[in-house]
C-alpha cells in the first residue's frame, strides 16, 4: 500500500498542487466560485491521470509521445490557471477604476470556455476508460477512480452553470452561455482525437490537452467575433457586450487572422486539390493524381490568394480597417522607421549569423543537441528582451509574423511541397530532439509561442511589470542556465530515472532572480507599474524552476504559462 501511495505523489504533481494552491489562496471573494471549479477540475484531472498511469492500456489506441508521462493534470489546469490569474489581476484593476466590467466579463467567459474544453476532455477520457470494465485485470480501486473522476467533472459542470447564471441577466442569457461552453467542449473532444490520431507519437495527452484547449479558445473567440458582427441585431445585446465587447487592437486582429488563416489553410487546400484532381479525372480517367509540379503551383497560388485576399477581408469586416491590413502594417512600421527598421535589421543579422553558425556546428561537431538548442534560447533573449523594453507594440506584431512564417514553412515541410519541402525537412532535422518526430516538429513553435503568449496576454491593464517577460525569463534565462549548468556540473539528481540535477535547478532559479533584480529598476525608470512583492516573485520563480526540474512534458509550452499565471497574482 505504501508503494501505491508513494507512486501517486510525484514531483510534477506536487509542483502543480503548489501552483494551484497559490492561485486559490490569492482569489478575492468575488472569484470563489471560479476557484471552486478550478479545484474540482484539478481533482478530476489528478484522478484521471492516476487511472491512466496505473492502467496505461486503457488509452492504448492513442499513440502518445514515448518517454513522457501522461501529463493530464498539468495539461488540464494550465490554461484555466492562466485565465483565473488574469481575472485576479483585472479585479484589482476594477477596484481602482483602471478597467471596465466588460473586460472582466470577457475574460470570465474565456476562463469558462477554457475550463469547459478541459472538462469535456476529462469526461471523454473517463468514459473511454469506463468502457473497459469487462477486462478482468481491472481492480475495484481502478473502477472507483474512474467513477470519482467522472463525478468530479459532472460537479464541475454544475459549478459552471451556477457561476454563469449569477453573472447573467436572464435565463435565456444563461442558456446561451451554457450552449457556448458545450460547443467548446464538443469541439475540444473532436480536436484532441484528431490531433492524437493525425500526429501519432508527437505529444503526450497533457500536451495535446493544452494545445487543444488553446486552439478551441482562440477559434471560439474568432467565431464569436464574426457571429457578433453578422448578427449583432439578432443576438441579444447583453450577450454580445458581455462576451466579446472589449476593444480589439489592429495588431491583435491581424495576428489572429494570420495564425488562424494558416491553420485553416490545409483544409482549404485539400478541398482545392480535390476539385482539381476531380477535373483531371473527368478529362482523363487514367490520371488519378496531379503531378508534384502542378501541386506546388496550386499550393502557392492558393496560399497567396487565401492570405492576401480572404483573410484580410475578414480582418476588415470585424475591425473596419480604413485600408488593406497589410498596408496598415507598412504604415505602422514606417511610423517610427529609425527604431523599427533598425530593430528588423538587427534581428535579421542575428538570425542569419546564429542559424548558419549553429547549423555548421550541428553537422561537424560533437556538441550535444540539447546544448545546441539552448543556444537558441539565449538568442531569443538577445532578440526579444531589448525589443520588449523599447518597442513592445512592434514586438507583438513581429511575433505574429514570425509564427505565421513558421506555420507556413511547417506546412510546406510536412507536405513536401517542391522545391522547399525536402531541404526544409533536412534543415529542421538538425535541431530536433526526442520530443520532435517525422510528423511534426514542435521545438521552434513552442519556443516562440512560449515567449510570445505572456506578452500578448499582458496587453491592456498590467500592474505586474515582469509578467510580459515570463517567457523570456523562464525559457531564455532559467531553462537555459539550468540545462547548461546541470549538464556540465550537475551531480545530484532529482530522481533516479531523470536527468535534471539540483545544481542545474539552483542555477536556473538564481539566474532568473538575478535578471529580475536588474530588470525592475530599469522598468521603474521607464514608468512601468511596479506593485509585486519580492516574496511573491521568489515563490513564482522557485515554483517555475521546480516545474522545469520535474516535468517530462514540453517545458517550452508549460513553464512560461505557469510562470505568467503566478506573476499575475
UniProtKB/Swiss-Prot annotation:
Membrane-spanning intervals of the chain: 23-43, 68-88, 109-129, 148-168, 179-199, 208-228, 253-273, 297-317, 341-361, 370-390, 394-414, 441-461, 465-485, 509-529, 549-569
Region CTP-binding, as annotated, extends over 487-503
Q: Which residues are glycosylated?
A: 289
Q: Which domain of life is it from?
A: Eukaryota
Lumenal compartment: which residues?
Answer: 44-67, 130-147, 200-207, 274-296, 362-369, 415-440, 486-508
Q: Which UniProt keywords apply?
A: Endoplasmic reticulum, Glycoprotein, Kinase, Membrane, Transferase, Transmembrane, Transmembrane helix
Described purpose of this protein according to its UniProt entry:
Essential for pollen development. Involved in protein N-glycosylation in the endoplasmic reticulum (ER), especially in the female gametophyte. Mediates pollen tube (PT) reception in synergids through protein glycosylation.
Which family is annotated? Answer: Belongs to the polyprenol kinase family.
Designated name of the protein: Dolichol kinase EVAN
State the organism of origin: Arabidopsis thaliana
Q: Which gene encodes it?
A: EVN
Amino acid at each position: 500500500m505504501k508503494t501505491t501511495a508513494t507512486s501517486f505523489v510525484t514531483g510534477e504533481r506536487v509542483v502543480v498542487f503548489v501552483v494551484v494552491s497559490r492561485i486559490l489562496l490569492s482569489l478575492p471573494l468575488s472569484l470563489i466560485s471560479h476557484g471552486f471549479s478550478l479545484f474540482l477540475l484539478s481533482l478530476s484531472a489528478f484522478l484521471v491521470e492516476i487511472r491512466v498511469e496505473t492502467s496505461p492500456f486503457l488509452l492504448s489506441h492513442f499513440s502518445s509521445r514515448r518517454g513522457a508521462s501522461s501529463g493530464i493534470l498539468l495539461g488540464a489546469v494550465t490554461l484555466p490557471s492562466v485565465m483565473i490569474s488574469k481575472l485576479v489581476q483585472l479585479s484589482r484593476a476594477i477596484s481602482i477604476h483602471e478597467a471596465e466590467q466588460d473586460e472582466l466579463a470577457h475574460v470570465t467567459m474565456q476562463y469558462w470556455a477554457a475550463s469547459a474544453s478541459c472538462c469535456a476532455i476529462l469526461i471523454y477520457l473517463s468514459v473511454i476508460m469506463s468502457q473497459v470494465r469487462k477486462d478482468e485485470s481491472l481492480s475495484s480501486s481502478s473502477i472507483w477512480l474512474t467513477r470519482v473522476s467522472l463525478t468530479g467533472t459532472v460537479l464541475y459542470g454544475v459549478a459552471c452553470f451556477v457561476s454563469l447564471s449569477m453573472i447573467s441577466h436572464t435565463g435565456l442569457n444563461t442558456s446561451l452561455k451554457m450552449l457556448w461552453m458545450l460547443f467548446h467542449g464538443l469541439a475540444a473532444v473532436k480536436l484532441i482525437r484528431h490531433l492524437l490520431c493525425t500526429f501519432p507519437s508527437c505529444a503526450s495527452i497533457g500536451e495535446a490537452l493544452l494545445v487543444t484547449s488553446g486552439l478551441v479558445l482562440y477559434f471560439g473567440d474568432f467565431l464569436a467575433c464574426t457571429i457578433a458582427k453578422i448578427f449583432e441585431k439578432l443576438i441579444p445585446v447583453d450577450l454580445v457586450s458581455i462576451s466579446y465587447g472589449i476593444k480589439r487592437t489592429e495588431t491583435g486582429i491581424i495576428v489572429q487572422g494570420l495564425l488562424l488563416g494558416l491553420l485553416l489553410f490545409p483544409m482549404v487546400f485539400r478541398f482545392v486539390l480535390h476539385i482539381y484532381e476531380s477535373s483531371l479525372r473527368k478529362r482523363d480517367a487514367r490520371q488519378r493524381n496531379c503531378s508534384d509540379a502542378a501541386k506546388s503551383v496550386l499550393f502557392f497560388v492558393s496560399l497567396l490568394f487565401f492570405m492576401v485576399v480572404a483573410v484580410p477581408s475578414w480582418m476588415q469586416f470585424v475591425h473596419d480597417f480604413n485600408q488593406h491590413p497589410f498596408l496598415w502594417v507598412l504604415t505602422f512600421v514606417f511610423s517610427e522607421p529609425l527604431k523599427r527598421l533598425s530593430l528588423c535589421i538587427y534581428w535579421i543579422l542575428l538570425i542569419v549569423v546564429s542559424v548558419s553558425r549553429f547549423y555548421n556546428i550541428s553537422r561537424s561537431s560533437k556538441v550535444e543537441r540539447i546544448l545546441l538548442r539552448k543556444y537558441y534560447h539565449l538568442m531569443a533573449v538577445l532578440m526579444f528582451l531589448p525589443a520588449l523594453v523599447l518597442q513592445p507594440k512592434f514586438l507583438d506584431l513581429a511575433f505574429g509574423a514570425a509564427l505565421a512564417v513558421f506555420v507556413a514553412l511547417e506546412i510546406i515541410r510536412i507536405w513536401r511541397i517542391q522545391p522547399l519541402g525536402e531541404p526544409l525537412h533536412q534543415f529542421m532535422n538538425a535541431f530536433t530532439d526526442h520530443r520532435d518526430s517525422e510528423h511534426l516538429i514542435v521545438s521552434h513553435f513552442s519556443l516562440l509561442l512560449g515567449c510570445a503568449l505572456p506578452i500578448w496576454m499582458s496587453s491592456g491593464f498590467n500592474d505586474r511589470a515582469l509578467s510580459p517577460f515570463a517567457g523570456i525569463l523562464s525559457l531564455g534565462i532559467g531553462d537555459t542556465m539550468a540545462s547548461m549548468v546541470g549538464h556540465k556540473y550537475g551531480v545530484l539528481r532529482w530522481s533516479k530515472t531523470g536527468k535534471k540535477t539540483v545544481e542545474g535547478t539552483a542555477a536556473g532559479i538564481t539566474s532568473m532572480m538575478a535578471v529580475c533584480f536588474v530588470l525592475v529598476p530599469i522598468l521603474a525608470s521607464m514608468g512601468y507599474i511596479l506593485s509585486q512583492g519580492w516574496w511573491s516573485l521568489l515563490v513564482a520563480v522557485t515554483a517555475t524552476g521546480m516545474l522545469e526540474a520535474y516535468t517530462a512534458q514540453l517545458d517550452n509550452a508549460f513553464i512560461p504559462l505557469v510562470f505568467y499565471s503566478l506573476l499575475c497574482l
